[in-house]
Amino acid sequence: MAKSKFRPLHDRVVVRRVESESKTAGGIIIPDTAKEKPQEGEIIAVGSGARDESGKLVPLDVKAGDRILFGKWSGTEVKLNGEDLLIMKESDIMGIIG
């Protein structure tokens, strides 16, 4: 029995990559083989948060729907419900866009 929802644990988030442009500003079309994986994404699920030294739950600074930037090698690639997603820790996120 497969579940349709995935809830990350602790301080992890699930991110959907935002596809980069297939054309440069000058109009040159970039083939798929030359494209780098985008380092921008949208958070689709967040964990409950991390615990501090005293055991108190500290909620995450990001929420579902936030657009973020993350490092080139951040996260673990997974396939959930046929969609390629990333699972990463909140500390791998560089910032929120907008």
Swiss-Prot record:
GO terms for biological process: chaperone cofactor-dependent protein refolding. It holds the Pfam family Cpn10. GO terms for cellular component: cytoplasm. Keywords: Chaperone, Cytoplasm. It is found in: Cytoplasm. PANTHER family: 10 KDA HEAT SHOCK PROTEIN, CO-CHAPERONIN GROES. Belongs to the GroES chaperonin family. Together with the chaperonin GroEL, plays an essential role in assisting protein folding. The GroEL-GroES system forms a nano-cage that allows encapsulation of the non-native substrate proteins and provides a physical environment optimized to promote and accelerate protein folding. GroES binds to the apical surface of the GroEL ring, thereby capping the opening of the GroEL channel. Heptamer of 7 subunits arranged in a ring. Interacts with the chaperonin GroEL. This is Co-chaperonin GroES 4.
